[in-house]
Amino acid sequence: MSTLREFDENYKQIIVGVDEAGRGPLAGPVVAAAVMIIQYFKELEEINDSKKLTEKKREQLFELIIEKCVVGIGIADEKEIDEINILNATFSAMRRAIKKVNEKTAFDIVLVDGNHKIREYNGKQEAVIKGDSKSLSIAAASIVAKVTRDRMLVEMSKEFPEYGFEKHKGYGTKLHKEILLEKGPCRYHRKSFLSKIL
């Protein structure tokens, strides 16, 4: 049995794992996912932290998780990030993701990646530092959040091809910063993140 699975099963409760993607980028939304694994299936053995997986493997696991687990996705766009700051926007996205799972089924506890409990969430929860490499449910949520956000940035790149969103996914790479200095921001950029660059 995988250690990630053991970690979850030790709780002896119905768990929802929560993680986010996109707290650091200069553009695009922050995306949160909440995942409840109803029944263990063999392919879950391949899951670990989404950052350690290839893009192709993440995509394959994403499809399986969506098909076989209870999944909720929450989004806070760049406008909301600018209005309430990235941490609060992340919590908003997480609450939206959990609400979508809650609309489908009941659960006992939320395990959230990181060292912050979700603000204004009144259910039972626990913050798990490096949770995406400890908990199977959080690792699954990590994959769903990352793939969902990456796909959104690819779509944004069709509207604004000159920014190369499909390559850097909105992160502050050298290329992205150079394009920003040359062209200025588009509507998907987080204005509150650009003060040190522009």
Whereabouts are the PLM-identified features?
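RNase H-like, Mg2+-dependent phosphodiesterase core
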Residues: 1-198
